[in-house]
C-alpha cells in the first residue's frame, strides 16, 4: 500500500490573536498545496486515497485541497498526527486498502519517514513523500518525493 506523507503549505504567522493551532494557509500556501497535490494526482492515476490530518487549521486546509485534487474517499482528523510516534499512528490509522495520506507537520513527518523506511528528506512546504509500505513486515521504501516547485512528473512506461 502507498503511504503519502504531506507537509502543509505556507501558513500565516502566529500573533497575539492567532495561536499556532489557528494558523491558516496563506494564498501562496494554497497555491503550493494545489501544485503538489496535482503532481501527486498524476502519480496516483485516479486511485482514491483516504486522508488523515492533524487538527491544526493549516493541515486541515491542506487536506481539503489534497482531497479536491486526488480523488479522496474521506478526510479524518487525527490527534495522533501531532506526535512523532509512528507505532501509535500505525496502530490507530493504518489498514489494508487504498493509499492513505497523512497531512502533518515537519518534525513528525521526518520522524515517520525515518521510522518506516530509514530515509531522510527535508520536507519543504507542501512537500510530499510517497512510501510503498508493507503492513505485514512493518517497513516501507521511499519511492517518490514531490514539491510544489516540481513542474512535471516523468511517467514510467
Residue ranges of model-derived segments:
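Domain-level recognition of soluble alpha/beta enzyme cores
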Residues: 117-143, 148-153
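Active-site-proximal alpha-helix that buttresses catalytic centers in soluble enzyme cores
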Residues: 2-78, 109, 119-126, 157
Amino acid at each position: 500500500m502507498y503511504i503519502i506523507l504531506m507537509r502543509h503549505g505556507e501558513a500565516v504567522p502566529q500573533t497575539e490573536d492567532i495561536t499556532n493551532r489557528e494558523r491558516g494557509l496563506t494564498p501562496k500556501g494554497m497555491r503550493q498545496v494545489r501544485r503538489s497535490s496535482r503532481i501527486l494526482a498524476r502519480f496516483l492515476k485516479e486511485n482514491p486515497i483516504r486522508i488523515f490530518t492533524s487538527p491544526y487549521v493549516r493541515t486541515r486546509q491542506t487536506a481539503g485541497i489534497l482531497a479536491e485534487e486526488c480523488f479522496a474517499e474521506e478526510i479524518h482528523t487525527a490527534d495522533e498526527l501531532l506526535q512523532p510516534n509512528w507505532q501509535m499512528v500505525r496502530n490507530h490509522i493504518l489498514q489494508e486498502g487504498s493509499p492513505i495520506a497523512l497531512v502533518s507537520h515537519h518534525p513528525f513527518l521526518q520522524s515517520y519517514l525515518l521510522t518506516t523506511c530509514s530515509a531522510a528528506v527535508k520536507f519543504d512546504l507542501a512537500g510530499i513523500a510517497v512510501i510503498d509500505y508493507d503492513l505485514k513486515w512493518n517497513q516501507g521504501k521511499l519511492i517518490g518525493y514531490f514539491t510544489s516547485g516540481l513542474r512535471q512528473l516523468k511517467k514510467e512506461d
